[in-house]
Amino acid sequence: MMTTEEEVLSPDDRDFVTALASGLEVVLAFDEAHPRMTLSEVAARTDMNRARARRFLLTLHALGYVRKQGRYFELAPRVLQLGYAFLSANNYRSVIQQVLEDITAESGESSSLGVLDGDAVTYVARSSAPHRLMAITLSVGTRLPAAHTSMGRALLAQLPDAELDAFLERVTLERYTDKTVTDKALLKKCILKVRQQGYAIADQELDSGLRSLAVPAFDANGKLLGAINISTNAARVDLDTLMREYLPLLQRKAREIRETVS
C-alpha cells in the first residue's frame, strides 16, 4: 500500500518497520552533548534494553556508521552521507547559502535557513557571524523546538489550520527562560499573528539574550523552501533596530530567493 504525501504510518501499521525506526533512533541518540557513549548510555538514551541496543550498535558498526573504541561508541564519518543525500537533492541550497552570506555581510549577524521537521525546526544552511549567540553551537543539522524559534513560527504559520491545531495538540511546551510562551492558546495567537504580518520574532524564549527574526522563503512557483532568519544578541540589537533595519533586509532577500530559485 502506498501512502499519500499527507499520510503517515503509525507504529502499529503492518508496513511500519520497527527495526529501521529503532536503528535510526540509535543514530540520533548521539549529539553534541553525547558524542561518545557506552552501551549502557545508548540503551538509556533510547529507552532500549542493553541486548537490543547492542544489536543495533554492532549492526551500525558493521555498516560503517558507528566506530567502536573500547567500551565507547561514536558516529563514524559515513553518517554524513545520509545528510548529504538530502542536501545534494535540494540544489537550491547553493543559491540560498549565498543569500545567507550576503545577509551576514550586510548585518554583521548570523543567518540561517530552517525547515519544519516534525515538531522541530532543522537548520539546513547557515552563515555564522564571529560572535556566539547560544550556549550550544548552531550548525547545519541543529534541531530546535519550532514553537520557540522565529523560523519555527514562520513555518508553523504556513500550515493549514488543521495541521496547526494537530501540532498544538501534541506538542509539549517546555519553559527555557522566563519569556518562553508555554500557554498553547497564547502560542496559537502568536502564530496566527505571524501568518497575518508575514514575519516572526522570537525574543529570548529559547535562550536568554537570543533575539531572532524570520520570514518564509518560497521559490518562483510558490513552493515553501523554509524560513530564513537573522539571529542577534538582545543586548546589542533592540527590537526597533530589528524591525527598522533587519526586517526589510530579510524581506528583500526572500524576494531574491523567489526570483532566483525555480
PLM regions with names:
Residues 217-220:
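Sensor-regulatory modules in signal-transduction proteins
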Residues 126-128, 205, 229:
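Short clusters of small/polar residues that mark proteolytic maturation junctions
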Residues 226-262:
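Juxtadomain coupling helices with adjacent low-complexity linkers
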Residues 74-171:
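Amphipathic alpha-helical effector-binding/dimerization core
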Residues 16-20, 76, 89, 93, ...:
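Short, structured helix-loop boundary elements
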Residues 2-94, 101, 255, 259-260:
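N-terminal helix-turn-helix
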Residues 95-103, 168-214, 260:
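Short, basic/aromatic recognition patches
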